[in-house]
A protein has these predicted regions:
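Interaction-interface detector
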Residues: 1-161
Length: 161
């Protein structure tokens, strides 16, 4: 196992470059299929984790807490937003510890998907979000613009430790 240097205070870009040069990419079989209720006519979206990003998540000590990204999104939502001025949130906060693959997918959801999609994902009339394996997706992209999450989908809630 490779030991991660103490990256607190190191620019996130430098951490990611170190990881890309040092860590073996990790190709996850999981992906996230999601629908945005604010775009009801849009097809389902599919989010796949980048193999280098997954390697960082599983290694630990590289990625900032997801809350840092939430703070930056709050800034972006302000009407007078022009550019980020709080990059220190990504660079100076203590990097998070190693994650399991499942926990990394949850982190990815909270980082990259709109919060209104994942916050109450299981409270709607139909599922808005599904974590599945790539093999569960259609093997062809024909009719891709018509993909939707099935309303008959049975959701099993599973706690990730």
């Amino acid at each position: 196992m490779i030991t991660t240097p103490d990256f607190q205070g190191t620019h996130l870009w430098d951490r990611l470059c170190w990881a890309k040069e040092t860590l073996e990419p990790y190709r996850s079989e999981y992906c996230v299929v999601w629908e945005d209720q604010e775009e009801p006519d849009a097809p389902a979206k599919v989010t796949h984790p980048d193999p280098n990003w997954m390697a960082c998540a599983i290694q630990g000590g590289i990625l900032p807490p997801v809350e840092a990204y939430w703070e930056l999104k709050k800034d972006e939502a302000k009407p007078d937003f022009t550019k980020h001025t709080r990059g220190y949130l990504l660079h100076n906060t203590k990097p998070i510890d190693a994650m399991t693959e499942e926990r990394a997918i949850e982190y990815l959801i909270m980082k990259d998907l709109p919060s209104h999609v994942w916050q109450n994902w299981d409270k709607a009339n139909k599922p808005r979000l599904v974590i599945c394996t790539k093999s569960q997706l259609p093997s062809t992209r024909v009719w891709r613009n018509a993909w939707k999450i099935s309303e008959e989908l049975t959701i099993t809630k599973q706690e990730v430790a």
